[in-house]
């Protein structure tokens, strides 16, 4: 066992040629995906440096581990690097990228570096429009509980580990597979998970949904012939693709024909309970420490992967029950005793209509007595335009809605695809009178007039609203009450 640990703990032991590489430079190092890979590499002993436009929790953690972080992009900062890793957010005219190319330093995308980490390991890659981060986190937690000591790279903070990446001492590598730029085609895992497929990031696929579906099939065919495709049969598009996949398939879902099926779903506040049914195995009662049917599906994916790897049910059930959650995935930031009574604050990353709908459904199912107040920040003008009517439909389902300006993510504004337009369209439906908040700083003075006793306040979106949610928590939602509050999560 000791030899295995030595073999798999260092990339240079798996690929001897990697010993030529001493210094790795990351352009756009502050992103969760980039930072996760960087953390694994710095823990492997590589000299690591990188740049981003601003400091954040990811860059601070990497600096604490010994990485050199530069704020801003300057061409001289790549000097001396043996390889440069670039984020998908980096434009072709970036000075560091241009300098690396001029100096003939190898330049690779994030997914290519992840593929090298995965090359000779037992890779588990989780793909899909929604649920990747939670599913990857659940799989990593199950493997950790089973003492498989995995390496993992996750797009969100795994609360139990205090990080989104970890270098393990075994042959297992569990990671998210990003379809947003089709770079997941670089990966060659042993197990691939498909959670669902919807129209998102369609600019990558030139607006062609058939091309998107075909790319997912290509991703599955990167599996070796002895690999396993774990697929959510509840998703109609995934179900449609099943006959086109020439690999062993294990399906999961609530559907009766699923190989790994959930029955008797009950949500008890933040927790979900269900009966697990698998072919040829006795039914088992399972509790997962996450709310909502969508999270039961994520748990089923983890169960399917672990069961195929012969992990004992005891470890699976314990890991799901003890799961401590992920940052910004229905994360409870506090329960505040205000001068108007108790208000619960929850923060969630979902930014696609289906994700927002799943979050709203879980909130209403777990806390049916509470009024649901949502602060929503749309993410990207293009997504708002492409899914406009879906956003109008789903955002109309809350009891009170505050809309922030669109978080552009570098995009130019698109007329008619902004928050003011959404407000007007939602108001015209006659169900809700949303409040447009032009300046985020207004929230601390606005919320005390909006919130009522017993409210569930949900901050929702993928932009900078997560930081805003924490600011609201620190400032007690704008209430000046001196009553004690309790943080529950």
UniProtKB/Swiss-Prot annotation:
One of its GO terms (molecular function) is ATP binding. Signal peptide: none annotated. Keywords: ATP-binding, Cell cycle, Cell division, Cell shape, Cell wall biogenesis/degradation, Cytoplasm, Ligase, Nucleotide-binding, Peptidoglycan synthesis. The keyword Thylakoid does not apply. It holds the Pfam family Mur_ligase. SUPFAM superfamilies: MurCD N-terminal domain, MurD-like peptide ligases, catalytic domain, MurD-like peptide ligases, peptide-binding domain. GO terms for biological process: cell division; cell wall organization; peptidoglycan biosynthetic process; regulation of cell shape. Cell wall formation. PANTHER family: UDP-N-ACETYLMURAMATE--L-ALANINE LIGASE, UDP-N-ACETYLMURAMATE--L-ALANINE LIGASE-RELATED. This is UDP-N-acetylmuramate--L-alanine ligase. It comes from Shewanella woodyi (strain ATCC 51908 / MS32). The gene is murC.
């Amino acid at each position: 066992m000791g030899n295995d640990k030595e073999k798999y703990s260092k990339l240079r032991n798996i690929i001897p040629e990697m010993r030529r590489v001493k210094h790795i430079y990351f352009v756009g190092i502050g992103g969760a995906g980039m930072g996760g890979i960087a953390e694994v590499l710095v823990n492997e002993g590589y000299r690591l440096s990188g740049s981003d436009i601003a400091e954040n929790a990811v860059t601070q953690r990497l600096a604490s581990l010994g990485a050199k972080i530069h704020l801003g992009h300057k061409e001289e900062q790549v000097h001396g690097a043996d390889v440069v890793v670039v984020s998908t957010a980096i434009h072709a005219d970036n000075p560091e990228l241009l300098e690396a190319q001029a100096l003939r330093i190898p330049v690779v995308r994030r997914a290519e570096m992840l593929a090298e980490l995965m090359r000779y390991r037992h890779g588990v890659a989780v793909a899909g429009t929604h649920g990747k981060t939670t599913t990857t986190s659940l799989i990593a937690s199950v493997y950790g509980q089973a003492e498989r000591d995995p390496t993992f790279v996750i797009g969100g903070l795994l609360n139990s580990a205090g990080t989104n990446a970890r270098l393990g001492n075994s042959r297992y590598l569990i990671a998210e597979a990003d379809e947003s730029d089709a770079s997941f085609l670089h990966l060659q895992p042993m197990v691939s998970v498909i959670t669902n497929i919807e129209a998102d990031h369609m600019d990558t696929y030139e607006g062609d949904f058939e091309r998107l579906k075909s790319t997912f099939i290509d991703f599955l065919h990167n599996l070796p012939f002895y690999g396993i495709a774990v697929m959510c049969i509840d998703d109609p598009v995934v179900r449609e693709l099943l006959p086109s996949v020439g690999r062993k398939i294990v399906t999961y879902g609530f559907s009766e024909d699923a190989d790994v099926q959930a029955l008797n779903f009950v949500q008890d506040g933040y927790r979900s309970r269900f009966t697990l049914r698998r072919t040829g195995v006795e039914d088992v009662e399972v509790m997962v420490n996450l709310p909502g049917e969508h999270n039961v599906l994520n748990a089923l994916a983890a169960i399917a992967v672990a069961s195929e790897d012969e992990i004992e049910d005891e470890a699976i059930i314990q890991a799901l029950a003890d799961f401590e959650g992920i940052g910004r995935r229905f994360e409870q930031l506090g329960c505040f005793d205000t001068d108007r009574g108790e208000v619960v604050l929850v923060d969630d990353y979902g930014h696609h209509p289906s994700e927002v709908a799943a979050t709203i459904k879980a909130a209403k199912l777990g806390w049916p007595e509470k009024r649901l107040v949502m602060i929503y920040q749309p993410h990207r003008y293009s997504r708002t335009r492409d899914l406009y009517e879906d956003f109008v439909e789903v955002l109309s389902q809350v009891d009170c809605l505050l809309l922030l300006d669109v978080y552009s993510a570098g995009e130019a504004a698109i007329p008619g695809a902004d928050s003011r337009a959404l407000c007007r369209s939602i108001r015209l439906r006659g169900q809700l009178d949303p409040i447009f908040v032009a300046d985020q700083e207004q929230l601390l003075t606005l919320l005390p007039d909006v919130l009522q006793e017993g409210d569930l306040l949900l901050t929702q979106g993928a932009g900078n609203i997560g930081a805003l949610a924490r600011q609201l928590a620190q400032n007690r939602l704008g209430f000046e009450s001196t009553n004690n509050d309790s943080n529950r999560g």
